[in-house]
């Protein structure tokens, strides 16, 4: 019998805290709130009015930090916003109407360099850049003085937050980065990952694991089942945390049974079915088995614990690589995305999507739902399920899956929410994934990018692959510092080119429901390759930096300075994993088979004294 023994790489969950929320037009769950668009522009001769000059002699009022309970709302996927700047500004807005997205640039003067030093060489009082956050505006200005200014408010109630410097921005970007060197000689040589919160706490999560398949006989070599997954939560973090804990285990168990039943050579259809069963069985436990346990216990505390993953929701993107066959399977539930990068004969990289964004705006998904629910004209409305939920496939989201009887019983006995009056024949949302299969070519240096949808709102598939390719060129041209660096150069080569080394594909329009870089239009910035930069050792961090502005350090700093949940109007939670395939050598010692790449991993937090 061929049995699979699991070995965990690393899993991670991080929490951050932030500030008070503003109103948005629509959140992911679909409740609409009208938001006015600030269309006034400050004339050039009045821009000085947005310069806040507080000297060290002037009294400064400090607001006390307020700790909030866990936020549960996943805010605007499509929002009407305005980004207004007085001294230095950027912005654009786009409005959402029905299934179309209209974009118009406004206030596009662009970021310029701002002062963070004394106004005159002889001055002892520093001038610092600040963000001014109002109810309907965001502006930048300067603050003169030496005292702390975070959480300070002016006479009009606007919060004034000191802008992060370039170094502080890099520290924030790299705070949650991790990198691992894989020296198992089985097709994978390295993987990098990073997270950047926007919600408070972050609603994304991720998981990684090796399932080691032992040898059957002396003449056979073992193989690895390698898993990487990103989970994009909405309406809270509890569902994505549940997936981090259990999804790989459920899928590996189904795969193990399938391989045993198929004599270690199951059909491709059987493997796909096993992955789908792992997904749907876990969702059944989250949505339905939890209800049975809650009704048996008749306890509010038990209900609060067990129903939390059912009431919130999460997309899931899971990759499964079999080192023996070099087959890579990607199972997608929701709108996270996987893209494969492969070097072509001319030295450039090609970008191949391995998943499709599953939303109400995807024509195939909309047609599937209309066939499953005939006669229900509002099953997909404005690109959303029943006019509310954007992903058409997701874990949790029980209000779209429970029967009316169950939902009403839970609402009366505990604290469940009321269902939509449009709900007639649930379930409307499924966790069953779409599975794709690709033959990986480690000898060509293939790589895989997995990311939640926040990244794809800022970069195209080709830009992501080209950015990884550009980063690889920089790494390969550096002097080797170890045996791994020599192997790296052998696999990925070394070259120097201008622009991104990627084959350009057909420009995406969004008509097929696939996410396009709407944030670039929202921010009103150029979409040419000159905006990109290479300055990070972790390639996942490198992708996020360039998604936020790249060379434009002031834009990067502004987007990173924005406190949660206000930041959600301009960027989503971000989780990115990049896996590099290659025929590296196997380490002699088992303890060296998977090691932390310290050059691309955030240092551990120092231990604090208890006394």
Model-derived segments and their meaning:
Residues 1-146, 155, 610-611:
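N-terminal mitochondrial targeting presequence
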Residues 67-69, 103-227, 233-611:
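PP2C/PPM-type serine/threonine phosphatase catalytic core
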